[in-house]
Amino acid sequence: MSSSVSSKTRYWVLALAAIVLDQWSKWAVLSSFQYRERVNVIPSFFDLTLVYNPGAAFSFLADQGGWQKYFFLVLAVAVSAYLVRAILRDEFATLGKTGAAMIIGGALGNVIDRLIHGHVVDFLLFYWQNWFYPAFNIADSFICVGAVLAVLDNIVHRKDGKKT
């Protein structure tokens, strides 16, 4: 098991880097912004802001009275545990392991928010004219990119039937 763990070090480092970058960025925003304050970075395209999300992506279940905090905590920990196990058992090729590590780091970054603040801290706001993409954070970005990598890994290796 120790050789398996040591050969996977780069994935644990990636997950930890995602958590650290996410938490540092949220600390910087929480230290610099008032709730709902917005600062334009790229005119008509990108702002930094501070908003709280008690739900999931796109504020899914945000207005449900609080139970969703525990649901998303359990879900994130369960998915992360499954992905850790999958990495350790070599159930993914390199691309999939990289994606899994990114998902783990992002999920645990948001878990930390839920435990400390009771909600997730979001601050990246992209928009065009009257269209706004929901505010999100670095952890969400790691989760999304990780999911794309995992899907690509699955598509590529489903075709050739082997892991690399």
Curated annotation (Swiss-Prot):
Membrane topology qualifier: Multi-pass membrane protein
Pathway: Protein modification; lipoprotein biosynthesis (signal peptide cleavage)
Gene Ontology biological-process entries: proteolysis
Catalytic reaction list: Release of signal peptides from bacterial membrane prolipoproteins. Hydrolyzes -Xaa-Yaa-Zaa-|-(S,diacylglyceryl)Cys-, in which Xaa is hydrophobic (preferably Leu), and Yaa (Ala or Ser) and Zaa (Gly or Ala) have small, neutral side chains
Domain of life where this protein originates: Bacteria
Phylogenetic classification of the source organism: Bacteria, Pseudomonadati, Pseudomonadota, Betaproteobacteria, Neisseriales
Keyword Transmembrane attributed: yes
Active site positions: D122, D140
Transmembrane segments: 11-31, 41-61, 64-84, 92-112, 132-152
Main location group: membrane
Protein name: Lipoprotein signal peptidase
Entry EC number(s): 3.4.23.36
PROSITE patterns on file: SPASE_II
Family statement drawn from the similarity comment of this UniProt entry: Belongs to the peptidase A8 family.
Molecular function terms from GO: aspartic-type endopeptidase activity
GO CC, any one term: plasma membrane
